[in-house]
Amino acid sequence: MEIFRFHTTIPTMISSMALTLILSLCGHAAVAQDSKLRDASSCHISSSLQGQWPDTDFTRCTIDLSEIRSGGPPKDGIPSLDMPDFIALSEADYEPQSPLISVVFDGEARAYPLSILIWHEIVNDHIGETSFSVTYCPLCNTSVVFARDHGTYTLDFGTTGQLRHSDLVMYDRQTESWWQQYNGEAIAGALAGQSLTILPSRLESFAEFSERHPSGMILDIPSDHQRPYGITPYNGYDSARYPFLYEGSLPEGIGALERVVVVNDEAIALFHLMQARRLERGDIRLTWSSGQASALDKAVISEGRDVGTVIAQRQEDHGKLVDVPYKVTFAFVWHAFNPESPIIGVTADEQ
């Protein structure tokens, strides 16, 4: 019988086993990603888009790319902000009800007003060691913050000028893969089948952010872009009967552009939460309070009707409430991406 020498052979075996496990896990991840891919012949990309995007591998896709619709602007026609500047809240000129997206990383709080994001849709930023992208799709009223560190890449995102289900399709400048903004999934290109990490953020008012973070910083108005910041080109949109550039079915029992709160793969009608003020969904606590203007109502954003602020938090074992990722989007958007899933609060049996 062969006797193993502990001080050499056993550690080598353990290291080998660990490496095998890591490689196995990586292999499983690769298989999981590849399992989402369609056969290249069913990607159905148009020759026009292929010509405009020569560096995107459209043979790798997770959806039927014939679902893609042009939003009008070309690639980067809606320019992302890649070197954002910030100012102190005392230097900013916003009404208390002005809507913004806020994040807190490494103890530093920053705010991104929708009056700026509505014209740029993506801000590529970092705080300390955390690189992230703040994104907003006006046609879906969907705000999502993504981690930019992804595998071996630190991704920078731009706008394709394309939409799917009326939702922004982003691309990364490292691989030119296309990403669905609503869920952070790569739908075409080298990274197709992979998903971005969604980070906690809030969609709240200037007053609420200022009260929570008086020393926080706010995105400065870009000086190198000529846009009518503070004005929305989508005035009256969230009171419309039908969504723009959307061809899918609509949800039953609720208006297509009624707001819903999406958290933990559930959608709750905003009017249901507004009536209750507070709801418990498993380990998630949702609260609503008034004081935030809609960015898609009046031409002057700060004059938009009050749609209020939603906070989504999880109670940890020690009782502390921590923010979790959530979305406040439109009912048709939830239905487009989750056609078989109900919206809670629409009927009496969906409570």
Task: Give the residues covered by each predicted segment.
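Bacterial N-terminal signal peptides
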Residues: M13-C26
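Mid-to-C-terminal functional-domain signal that highlights helix-capping/loop sites
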Residues: Q33-Q351
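N-terminal secretory signal peptides that target proteins for export/translocation
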Residues: M1-P11
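Sec/Tat signal peptide C-region and signal peptidase I cleavage site
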Residues: H28-A32
